[in-house]
Amino acid sequence: MRGVLVTLAVLFLTGTQARSFWQHDEPQTPLDRIRDMVDVYLETVKASGKDAIAQFESSAVGKQLDLKLADNLDTLSAAAAKLREDMAPYYKEVREMWLKDTEALRAELTKDLEEVKEKIRPFLDQFSAKWTEELEQYRQRLTPVAQELKELTKQKVELMQAKLTPVAEEARDRLRGHVEELRKNLAPYSDELRQKLSQKLEEIREKGIPQASEYQAKVMEQLSNLREKMTPLVQEFRERLTPYAENLKNRLISFLDELQKSVA
């Protein structure tokens, strides 16, 4: 329980800013978040697209055109998956660069959090001991009440409720008092930790990771290299889709011509 209290207390002090430092997984980079959002969007479009295609192909116009959109959508999905697979090494390269450049900062923040955790440990131990003691006291007080519940008749329900209500209210008020006491004890360390985090963020804005000009040049170089490597992959992706796009266009033109003739 002590370990859980320590972790919850530090997260309470720092908010979500410090969450990744207490997890075994590596922190999610901006690139990770962008990739996840794109994947979710593509999956949503794919799912909704299949429903729309199924409705269209089952219609009279869809049957007449016989565009085989579902097959083409699967081909498009396969091509997109291959493009994503081909991009993976370059994405990994940029992500590793970001993690390397922020390693020193993350180490400093982890050290600050460890120091705060040690400072607040006595308060958490005290809170845990009081909480456990209170629960044990009320467990003992409720033991005879529980026995009465076994023999409870309908006529005694209100009487039993009258006995339980003040016990529950007292327990609630005393536990709230312990929580409030813990909050007051942790307040100075919360301010200290927030100040340190703000200071580190200010250092990033002023100095960069490492120096701003150096880091910017490195990022631009990486992006330029990435763009050069990605160009042939995107071109290949376009070439694979061209036949299906042309086929779709020709079928639509043919259908419109036939429709115009029938109207005329």
Swiss-Prot record:
Primary location: secreted
GO BP: any one term: positive regulation of phagocytosis
Entry keyword set: Cholesterol metabolism, HDL, Lipid metabolism, Lipid transport, Repeat, Secreted, Signal, Steroid metabolism, Sterol metabolism, Transport
Region named 10 X approximate tandem repeats: 67-264
Localization per record: Secreted
InterPro entries: ApoA_E, Apolipoprotein_A1/A4/E
Tissue: Major protein of plasma HDL, also found in chylomicrons.
Pfam families reported in the protein's UniProt record: Apolipoprotein (PF01442)
SUPFAM superfamilies from the UniProt entry: Apolipoprotein A-I
GO CC aspect terms: chylomicron; endocytic vesicle; extracellular space; extracellular vesicle; high-density lipoprotein particle; low-density lipoprotein particle; spherical high-density lipoprotein particle; very-low-density lipoprotein particle
Intervals holding Sequence repeats: 67-88, 89-110, 111-121, 122-143, 144-165, 166-187, 188-209, 210-231, 232-242, 243-264
Signal peptide: 1-18
GO molecular function: amyloid-beta binding; apolipoprotein A-I receptor binding; chemorepellent activity; cholesterol binding; cholesterol transfer activity; enzyme binding; heat shock protein binding; high-density lipoprotein particle binding
Subunit (UniProt): Homodimer.
Family (UniProt): Belongs to the apolipoprotein A1/A4/E family.
Function: Participates in the reverse transport of cholesterol from tissues to the liver for excretion by promoting cholesterol efflux from tissues and by acting as a cofactor for the lecithin cholesterol acyltransferase (LCAT).
Name of the protein: Apolipoprotein A-I
